[in-house]
């Protein structure tokens, strides 16, 4: 089953945008927001456009089990902060390649130094 979930996560990462569902803890309300997602040679990554102030990001740190969905297709994933500079550079390149031409201003924002620490690896569970 984990292989199927991982395959679906990679498939969803091909989408321009996904929705991420987060909650601070099991008793808290569920929140859903649209975000960008990128596949890299190191894994699948997401990042908070609002930096560390983003609610979904804060909730994902507090409760790293999230749901990533496109329409009716969804996968449960565990997110974990990425600190490796080599991987961060690969994620930057993936954002540029996937979004840079169509959304140059928004992509530039996603590559700001203040946003980079919000890079999270998504691992299907």
Language-model region placement:
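Extreme N-terminal tail/first-helix region
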Residues: 1-19
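Short low-complexity stretches enriched in small and charged residues
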Residues: 1-4, 28-36, 73-78
């Amino acid at each position: 089953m984990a292989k199927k979930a991982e395959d679906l996560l990679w498939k969803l990462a091909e989408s321009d945008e996904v929705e991420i569902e987060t909650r601070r803890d099991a008793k808290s309300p569920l929140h859903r927001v649209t975000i960008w997602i990128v596949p890299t040679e190191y894994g699948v990554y997401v990042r908070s456009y609002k930096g560390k102030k983003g609610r979904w990001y804060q909730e994902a740190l507090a409760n790293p089990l999230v749901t990533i969905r496109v329409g009716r297709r969804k996968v449960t994933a565990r997110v974990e902060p990425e600190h490796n500079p080599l991987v961060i550079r690969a994620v930057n390149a993936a954002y540029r390649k996937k979004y840079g031409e169509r959304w140059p201003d928004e992509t530039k924002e996603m590559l700001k130094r203040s946003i980079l620490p919000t890079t999270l690896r998504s691992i299907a569970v």
